[in-house]
Amino acid sequence: MQYWGKIIGVAVALIMGGGFWGVVLGLLIGHMFDKARSRKMAWFANQRERQALFFATTFEVMGHLTKSKGRVTEADIHIASQLMDRMNLHGASRTAAQNAFRVGKSDNYPLREKMRQFRSVCFGRFDLIRMFLEIQIQAAFADGSLHPNERAVLYVIAEELGISRAQFDQFLRMMQGGAQFGGGYQQQSGGGNWQQAQRGPTLEDACNVLGVKPTDDATTIKRAYRKLMSEHHPDKLVAKGLPPEMMEMAKQKAQEIQQAYELIKQQKGFK
């Protein structure tokens, strides 16, 4: 009920014998209480809406990316299942993800419209938008290569989310570097199975993860590291609208950034 604060404020004033002005004061205090409560309820409603949209759009677009290559293969479905496993999706959550994936595979999936809606709901939360794009890039690279059609779809996504081509290309390099720290999947040479990338990470890989150059000084590298860790902090992302089911992915990304930073410090000899 929206008027509990006013009712209680007036009742307290009457009980305490505050007279006319006491009632007015109680009414004003109650009104302030009701407004604060209403804002809090609206925030929770918007938060749930944002999380639900993020979840559904993630898997819809993933399905659209997969379909863009042509026929959806068993390997593609296996990759999507692996991602659901990484998120610990089971029961109703997994079914919802699978249904969203199927929606995205439809021939007339309105990608641009969906991205505009997503951007609107995530307005002012660039770290959420960045996390969404990183998930899509990771899914596109999951088979060890980026199909030209997948790249075209990713460019559309970036454009609609307000991300420049230069920013997007940097994200690609960062995700490719992250694959060597456990953030990607590559196809084995035979059998059609999939496994995590096994080539050991290099200094260049680590620098790509942080978006810096091997020649950058320690101050520049530390600044980039702290910025990325802040943007990928799991609790902050969930507070801004990341579905709780995807917190594990945010944690894994933060671990990649940490590992890359440790390798750079070791290779360049600074603390």
From Swiss-Prot:
NCBIfam families: PRK09430.1. Pfam families: DnaJ, TerB. GO terms for molecular function: protein-folding chaperone binding. Regulatory DnaK co-chaperone. Direct interaction between DnaK and DjlA is needed for the induction of the wcaABCDE operon, involved in the synthesis of a colanic acid polysaccharide capsule, possibly through activation of the RcsB/RcsC phosphotransfer signaling pathway. The colanic acid capsule may help the bacterium survive conditions outside the host. GO terms for cellular component: plasma membrane. It is a single-pass type III membrane protein. PANTHER family: CO-CHAPERONE PROTEIN DJLA (PTHR24074). It comes from Escherichia coli O6:H1 (strain CFT073 / ATCC 700928 / UPEC). The keyword Transmembrane helix applies. Residues 32-271 are cytoplasmic. SMART domains: DnaJ. Residues 1-6 are periplasmic. The chain crosses the membrane at residues 7-31. Signal peptide: none annotated. PROSITE patterns: DNAJ_2. This is Co-chaperone protein DjlA. Residues 205-271 form the J domain. Keywords: Cell inner membrane, Cell membrane, Chaperone, Membrane, Transmembrane, Transmembrane helix. Homodimer. InterPro entries: DjlA (IPR023749), DjlA_DnaK_co-chaperone (IPR050817), DjlA_N (IPR007791), DnaJ_domain (IPR001623), J_dom_sf (IPR036869), TerB-like (IPR029024). The transmembrane domain is a dimerization domain. It is found in: Cell inner membrane. Its main location: membrane.
